[in-house]
């Protein structure tokens, strides 16, 4: 499926912006999936550090040993599969499945109680905004910050992926789109947007309906629909925390060059029934069996032990997955409580009997979506073309059985990847909403599942602005009833499904004098502009005061309107959003933790490299051949180094200077390499004959360097002669030509390398002159050869770059000559044309004079005058007289 989408994307891919990438995130309660799209990575799934396709939703926060309780450097965050195992050992530090708590307060007993049961041991507190925070090791973490940490870690991996694709790329994630349930209210939506706003690098965030994400993916994958025939599908999405049934119509116009239209038609949901509920049911079965087997353990005692409950929940989750494919699951929990190991089994039949009361609830959202369609839609269940399965829990056998009973087996569509359809769809919608790239066009009609209303402070009646089923994004203006007086301030309350969530205070006092009853004889009204954004946030964009006055003109009356825009402020009711200062503080805190995590990871990685190198070095030293024939001084030095550094490793802590570790890695590596090279050279004679050969090679290389210098000098001298008319100073132009950065960097140490090479040649000459050869000097001779080989290799590489660079610069001089030569030619030709034009103009003037003279002669002859060449106008007049 993903290959099909990638093909569609590639064929339509056109970058609108640059250096940007879109990250689509399917933010689930239990798992998170992400896809990044950029010019370097069309539809690339962001894998976890363990190369898995989905990420555990949550993280663990621990305090490192050796740090004070208030030391900000002592915090370690763990993500990925390791978090699952930490939940049973450190339940009070493991923060999982946070999605249902977004935009909630501790007053929401149903949500909070259910979460506490699923995640025992965590301490929840209320913030000053009435939202939920977790207290971990006496540090308070607002829910938005925890979600942002999770998202930031994924965005960082996406950026690393782009860098791995092309090290030269400057693409980075700056836009993000999230899946979100349609039943999420204003507070929940704002909380998710706030979480995204405190991440680093994310400039724009978009919220996309989970159902619409799957529908978009389905259309792009299906590709072909009967032209002119409207089809109806239901996306049945059963995830970990909820069930959603989204009804859509899909229409391919008869003109198949026109885009497909996807329209949201109906919705049903259950916010608490999902995979997590089934996990808790299996956990209850395990708990009951344990208490029956161990009557000495009381229920209260078991429930007071967070680790025991976490182990039961973990075993229940594994059993649920096994029962999806098998009829029985074995349970094995070590040291459940009081060092008691517990073993039992759960059958699928036991599980299905236990949840029998929930069976009707499984399909109720589908019935609700059909019976509560928006507007005038009236599609019946038998007319549905198919039910598209999404969400991991839709694979549970009892769930599929209920769906088949409701709509028949052939209408249950399994050709969509239940795990990844939403993330594929949300990234495509994110691309469209952000206008980042051009893709296959789709007409998407999204509708609100809630009704949005307002109430003025002096009235009791609610006025609907956007009713259930209204398409969005949408904007509308409403003119209020006329009033005779203007208060200093008045309020507008905003409601979602009749529940107050925000109060707008309008400052009208500033215009009271301008809108008095004398000036507005017909009264004053307010024109309020409401907006339902693409994120389905309901807000007021503008409030205008309208003055209505009556002017008598004869027997008729003309109404004259004039308006002023009023300032207003907004305040969340009950649950409040993060303030700008809180956003800034949390953003900086996450940046600090990211920096510390990166440094800690690099530190630990370097420690591991050092430890590995030390053990490799020790193994080398224990080799019989090295012990007998190795370079004794270097073997002794490395042996002592290994012993000292291994002892040093025992005491290394995060306070250790990272440079010390890198320095030790380098020292071990250099010495180990020398010994290995020495052993590899065991068959080399290292005698005078070999050194004479080395000396000859060295002189040849120095001669090659000198020859190249002379060649360049000859060319420059030749150019000075040949290009004297076009280039004033050839040598100066040659020096001015810049070489590539990598060449300049490599040649910055040319003189140093050349000097070291000459010194090694001098050392060879000294040994040859004194005939210092023999087994007792073998180590020293090898060291000389090693130095010679190293500097020769470096010098040869640098000479190659010099030759290439000089050749390029000489070619540039030739090009400069040609450019200047052509420029001179153009100037000469231009001057020549100018001279020719002037000459031509002069010739024309001469010819004109001759013609005029001939005319004069004719006139004179006709007048019978003898003067053939009058010298002045005065003479001509005189003759005429």
Swiss-Prot record:
GO molecular function per UniProt: adenyl-nucleotide exchange factor activity; ATP binding; ATP hydrolysis activity; ATP-dependent protein folding chaperone; unfolded protein binding
Residues carrying covalently attached carbohydrate according to the record: 128, 458, 474, 481, 489, 527, 844
Basic and acidic residues bias (residue ranges): 833-844
Compartment annotation: Endoplasmic reticulum lumen
GO biological process, one term: response to unfolded protein
A Pfam family this chain is assigned to: HSP70
E.C. number: 3.6.1.-
Gene Ontology terms: cellular component: endoplasmic reticulum; endoplasmic reticulum chaperone complex; endoplasmic reticulum lumen
Signal peptide: 1-20
UniProt keyword terms in alphabetical order: ATP-binding, Chaperone, Endoplasmic reticulum, Glycoprotein, Hydrolase, Nucleotide-binding, Signal
Reactions that this protein is recorded to catalyse: ATP + H2O = ADP + phosphate + H(+)
Protein family membership: Belongs to the heat shock protein 70 family.
Subunit relationships: Interacts with the heat shock protein 70 (HSP70) KAR2, and this stimulates nucleotide exchange on KAR2. KAR2 in turn acts to stimulate the ATPase activity of LHS1.
Protein name stated in the entry: Heat shock protein 70 homolog LHS1
Species whose genome carries this gene: Saccharomyces cerevisiae (strain ATCC 204508 / S288c) (Baker's yeast)
Lineage, opening ranks: Eukaryota, Fungi, Dikarya, Ascomycota, Saccharomycotina
